[in-house]
Structure formats: C-alpha cells, structure tokens
Design a protein with these regions (language model features):
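Conserved alpha-helical scaffold segments that buttress catalytic/binding sites
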Residues: 2, 6-207
Length: 207
C-alpha cells in the first residue's frame, strides 16, 4: 500500500511487522487483520473509498470493544478511515470534543476531485460541519517549504493550529509540550497520527 497518487513515496511494505515487534511483546498485542486501502492508478483504479469504509468499520468495532487501536502502514489515505471510525464509535456522542493531533510535515488538507493521502483531514473537517460532535485539528512539524499558500489559507479558514518544524526545533521542548498539552486538555477524545516525514532525513533516511 503506497502513497504515489498523493505525490509521495511508495511503501516498501516491510515496516509493519518490525514496528509491531518493537511496539509491544507479542502477548500484549493482537493483530486485527489487514485492510487494503488502495488508491490505484489511472490504468488500474483502486477502491480507495471501499477500503476506507471497511477500515472505518473495523476501527469503530475495536473502539466499541474498548481496545486501544493502532493502524499501521501506507500513508495518510488511512487517516480519513481512522477519523471516520472514531466518530462512528460509541466513544463519540453528541457534544463530544474530538481532537486530531497530527505529527507531520504536511497539512493534508488538499482540495482535490478524488480523495488521496493528501485530503483526509479536510474530509474529516467537512464531515464535522453540522455534526453533533466537535472536531479540532492540530499539526506539529509543518514544513513551510512543502505546503502551498492555499494550504495555509485552508488551515486558517478551518481553525487549524500548528507548530512548524523550525519552531519545534528552535523552541524549548517544554514549550512544545505545553502547546500539545493545551490542545489535548481541550478535547474529550484524541486521535493521534504520525507521518514519518515529520522526522529529519538524517534520522529517517528514505522517508
């Protein structure tokens, strides 16, 4: 599962098992199975929406079973399904303040005719319009060079808050932690998502 249609790198497909091994001992985790969330190409269209719908259903079910749920693999084409599954679950009721905290170099608020790894959080924010729950979105690690002016404009219009990569590097760590804690304290339910491109190339070459 790669992110080429979102103008990203193809997933080598080897990371999931290694992350699982590093995350927790085998007796403390359970594999809920694989879901293909595939954008495809012009020559071989994938069923991105179908995969997202299946993944959202699985996530909602796991959360309703009070299971800490982690989605691994691919790019942020899985993020819309994750947000959708969360708000469909019993964890979110009328008036619930949902927060999405994204560690990422990109906003992923792209306006596009088709969903991709670059569109999920704009989709989620639009879904929240008129919904009974509230949704806030914050990003740590934004690269000013890798987000267009239009994306910054969209972020401002949507009430998104962010810390740039340079701010995160030059600020006191305590200050960044305080900023994150302030966001977390203002929501009832938190969805944390991490895109590895938030890491410097020297730390994560090839991302």
């Amino acid at each position: 599962m790669g992110v080429q249609p979102g103008v990203g790198l193809l997933d080598p497909g080897l990371g999931d098992d290694r992350v699982l091994l590093a995350a927790a001992p085998e007796d403390l985790r359970s594999d809920a199975g694989d879901v293909v969330v595939e954008m495809g190409s012009e020559d071989a269209p994938g069923d991105l929406e179908g995969g997202q719908e299946e993944l959202a259903g699985r996530i909602a079910g796991l959360l309703d079973a009070h299971t800490l749920t982690v989605v691994l693999g691919g790019g942020h084409e899985t993020a819309y399904a994750s947000a959708t599954g969360l708000v469909r679950s019993g964890r979110v009721a009328a008036g619930t303040r949902v927060g999405i905290l994204n560690l990422d170099a990109h906003f992923d608020l792209r306006e596009a005719p088709r969903p991709s790894s670059g569109t999920p959080f704009l989709q989620a924010l639009r879904d929240a319009e008129g919904a009974e729950h509230q949704l806030s979105y914050a990003v740590v690690g934004i690269s000013e060079a890798n987000n267009t002016r239009a994306l910054f404009d969209t972020a401002r219009e949507r009430g998104v808050t962010w810390v740039t990569d340079e701010q995160a590097q030059t600020a006191d760590v305590t200050g960044v932690r305080r900023w994150v804690r302030s966001f977390i304290n203002a929501v009832d339910v938190l969805y944390l998502t991490i895109d590895l491109d938030v890491l410097p190339a020297a730390v994560a070459p090839g991302v």
